[in-house]
Regions:
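Winged-helix-like regulatory helical subdomains adjacent to P-loop NTPase cores
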Residues: 226-339, 345-346, 373-383
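The catalytic "switch" region of P-loop NTPases
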Residues: 9-10, 144, 154-249, 254-255, ...
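Active-site metal-binding core of divalent-cation-utilizing nuclease and nuclease-like domains
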Residues: 430-458
């Protein structure tokens, strides 16, 4: 069977194109050798399950590994510590019962089977007996035992699970005297060390953690450009497309920042839809992805509903160019980072990747489309702004300036400074909707300057949106925009200046530098 790109469940190298995670596994193995208990918390579809699967295979020569998941457990299993203990032992049995010709495993099978038979009628194991079971298992086996539990988020709000963790913690602290697991690894989205952490101010027991013994696995689990290129090399060896592997890997990572699901999803779309392994194919895949309803975006929407403070944070960054100093003690920033929506860069908060950013823009702008005059205006004049498959950007900016001054000219300056760029996003959205995409260059997203890049039918348009701060500041902005044009190999750029000087000159002007030019429109 031919290999394919995988976006669901565990990745298997014989079935799927996947990156090399051997370095990641070796780092976890070193922690296990040191007897560390470990937490792996990353966003949804970040490769946690695949990591645990291949870790178990890597460890099986020197350890007895029980890899279980709470994903399929229903609430009945968490009814009490006794029912949860029984469910854990039962899952351990399911994992080990078919393994043969292994003395250490045979010993473990006997202890587990005897325990289940003893308590099978009530399907409950008292906590003290569960503790004895762990000690007997770890003492009698010929190899150290590692327990990994995936999808622990499903259990995080049950007191029964917290009590089980307290038991494991107690045994860890007394392991010099009482046999216990060599290592326990808990994987999920939420940081299990802050099990009760919530964003809402009325949340209680926020730091009631029974798991402060564990070390977080901090190594980067996103795909580097090198890893993406290695995966594409495997694909190219099979399909002979003639792609420029380094260039394609770089472009994919520009959109995804290496988020595993997003990298694999774009590759899958290009492959299955025959979009072409080139810049245009990637842009087309991005457009398709942003229109999809899938589990990844469903989870994003749910998180925004469940955590309105995070939605406000992301909106402030994207809409208003607000900057935030990254502080891990801030609960909103902590949780947003835990979901992999933001990350820390040089002490500041950044949106994690361009795909998430573009989807967030779509969400936020969609909330306002129906009532937005700017959106209606852009939709009304859409046919005038497209000619022979190209955007007539000069005309778009000129018309927006007229519209903005007509509708918002009487508003307060502070209102316009905060809102102007958002209105332009609403204005441009119906013009390019269904055909193009746009995103904001993260390094320029601040209160005074924002660079918008529009991809439309294979052509890029760069618009610098900024607040007028005087002639010298404006000249620096022009110089920076010319540098961007060089970087993107584009000869024409655009500048949209929001000026509150009553003596401003609203007519568009053209600034030239060699073969390149900038059209500036003042609003």
């Amino acid at each position: 069977m031919a290999k394919k790109f995988n976006i669901t469940g565990t990745c298997y190298p014989e079935k799927h194109y996947m990156v090399d995670i051997s370095e990641r596994l070796s780092k976890i193995e070193s922690l296990i050798e040191d007897g560390e208990y470990i937490t792996i918390n990353r966003g949804r579809q970040y490769g946690k399950t695949t990591t645990l699967y291949h870790l178990a295979k890597k460890l099986q020569e020197n350890y007895v590994v029980f890899s279980i998941s709470f994903e399929a457990l229903d609430d009945c299993a968490f009814e009490s510590t006794e029912t949860l203990a029984y469910s854990i032992v039962e899952k351990m049995w399911q994992k080990i019962k078919k393994i043969e010709n292994n003395n250490a495993v045979e010993c473990a099978k006997k202890i587990i089977n005897d325990t289940l038979e003893k308590y099978t009628q009530k399907e409950k194991i008292p906590l003290t007996k569960f503790s004895d079971f762990i000690s007997d298992l770890c003492e009698d086996c010929q190899k150290p035992i590692v327990l990994t539990i995936d999808e622990v988020d499903n259990a995080s709000m049950f007191d029964s699970f917290i009590k089980i963790l307290r038991l494991l913690r107690d045994k860890y602290l007394n392991r010099n005297d009482i046999p216990t697991f060599q290592s326990v690894i808990l994987a999920g989205v939420y940081d299990i060390k802050n099990l009760k952490l919530k964003v809402r101010p009325d949340a209680d027991h926020q730091y009631n953690s029974p798991w402060n013994i564990a070390v977080p696995f901090k190594s980067d689990m996103s795909f580097s450009k090198t890893q993406t290129a290695q995966m594409l090399t495997d694909y190219e060896n099979d399909h002979k497309t003639g792609m420029n592997i380094s260039e394609i890997a770089s472009l994919i990572n520009d959109y995804t920042s290496g988020y595993p699901f997003l990298v694999s999803k774009l590759c899958l779309l290009i492959d299955e839809e025959n979009l072409g392994w080139n810049k245009e194919g990637i842009e087309q895949a991005v457009k398709i992805l942003l229109k999809e309803n899938n589990t990844f975006f469903d989870d994003l929407n749910k998180k925004l509903e469940d955590f309105p403070e995070i939605k406000t944070l992301l909106k402030d960054i994207l809409y208003y160019g607000k900057s935030f100093t990254f502080n891990p003690d801030n609960k909103v920033l902590n949780v947003a980072s835990m979901f992999n929506y933001i990350y820390e860069s040089n002490g500041s908060v950044k949106i994690s990747n361009r795909i998430i950013e573009m989807r967030l823009y779509n969400i936020f702008l969609s909330d306002e489309e129906i009532s937005s005059i700017s959106y209606s205006e852009g939709q009304t004049y859409k046919s005038q702004f497209i000619e022979n498959g190209e955007l007539k950007m000069d005309k778009i900016l000129e018309r927006f300036a007229v519209h903005f001054n007509d509708i918002y000219g009487g508003k307060e300056q502070t209102f316009r400074e905060e809102e102007g760029r958002r209105f332009f996003m609403l204005y441009i959205r119906p013009i390019i909707n269904g055909t193009g995409n746009y995103y904001i260059e993260a390094e320029t997203r601040d209160r005074s300057r924002t660079d918008m890049i529009i991809d439309y039918l294979g052509k890029q348009y760069i618009i610098e949106m900024k607040i007028w701060r005087g002639e010298s500041y404006n000249e620096r902005g022009e110089k920076q925009l010319f540098e961007y044009l060089d970087y993107y190999r584009i000869n024409k750029g655009y500048m949209l200046s929001f000026c509150f000087n009553k003596n401003k000159i609203p007519a568009p002007k053209t600034i030239k530098s060699g073969k390149k030019e900038i059209v500036e429109v003042v609003v």
